[in-house]
Amino acid sequence: MNLNSIPAFDDNYIWVLNDEAGRCLIVDPGDAEPVLNAISANNWQPEAIFLTHHHHDHVGGVKELVEKFPQIVVYGPQETQDKGTTQVVKDGETAFVLGHEFSVIATPGHTLGHICYFSKPYLFCGDTLFSGGCGRLFEGTPSQMYQSIKKLSALPDDTLVCCAHEYTLSNMKFALSILPHDLSINDYYRKVKELRAKNQITLPVILKNERQINVFLRTEDIDLINVINEETLLKQPEERFAWLRSKKDRF
C-alpha cells in the first residue's frame, strides 16, 4: 500500500492509503476539495473513510465525498454517528479495508469518544498523539489521555505514526523548554526546523524515535522526573503527564 498526505486548512493532514488497484482509504477528511483533487489526479477509487473523532476539521468533507462516491463505507466512533458514519466501531473491533484488518483502539482524552486505527505499520491517531506532543483535552481528563497515549506507545517500534496536524515544530520548542540539554530532542528540533523552513511535512514519524523525543511519552524518564521535582514532587507518571499537559496549555 502507498501512504499519502493531503494538506488541508492551516495545518491539517488528511491521510490516504491506496493499493495497487487504485482503491483508497481516506482518514479524517475535514475538507472534501483537496481530497477530490487528489482522487482525480491519481485516478483513485475511494472504498472507505476512517473518522477518529467528531471535530469539524476531521469530518467536514464526509458528506460531499459520499455524495460523489456513494459506495464509500464511513467508519467512526459513536460520537461521529451524526457526521456521516455508516459503520460505528469501538475498541477491540476491526475494520477490514483494502484487504487489511485495522484494529480499533479507544483513545479518550482529546474527545471522550476518540478512536485510532492500526494496521501494521500504519497508525492513524487523529488528535491523540502528535510528533513531540499530544492532543489538547477538550473533553477528557489527563488520566484518560495518559492511558490513551500509553496504549499507543506500546505498539511495535516500526509503527508509522500518522498524526492529523503539523504541530511538530511548536511541540519541539516546548520539549526544549522542558529538557533543553537533551541530545535527541535538540537533534530532532534542528531536523524539524529545517523541514518546516522548506515547508516540508514532518510526518509520519517512527514510533521508536518518537518515544525518545516526545516528553509526554517519557514520564518515567529520570531526566524528566528530575526537572519536574525541581518544581513539585509528583510520584506517579500520570501526575507528571498532567503537569506537562498543563505546562503545554500555557506555553
UniProtKB/Swiss-Prot annotation:
Belongs to the metallo-beta-lactamase superfamily. Glyoxalase II family. SUPFAM superfamilies: Metallo-hydrolase/oxidoreductase. GO terms for biological process: methylglyoxal catabolic process to D-lactate via S-lactoyl-glutathione. The keyword Zinc applies. It catalyses: an S-(2-hydroxyacyl)glutathione + H2O = a 2-hydroxy carboxylate + glutathione + H(+). Thiolesterase that catalyzes the hydrolysis of S-D-lactoyl-glutathione to form glutathione and D-lactic acid. Its EC number is 3.1.2.6. One of its GO terms (molecular function) is metal ion binding. Binds 2 Zn(2+) ions per subunit. This is Hydroxyacylglutathione hydrolase.
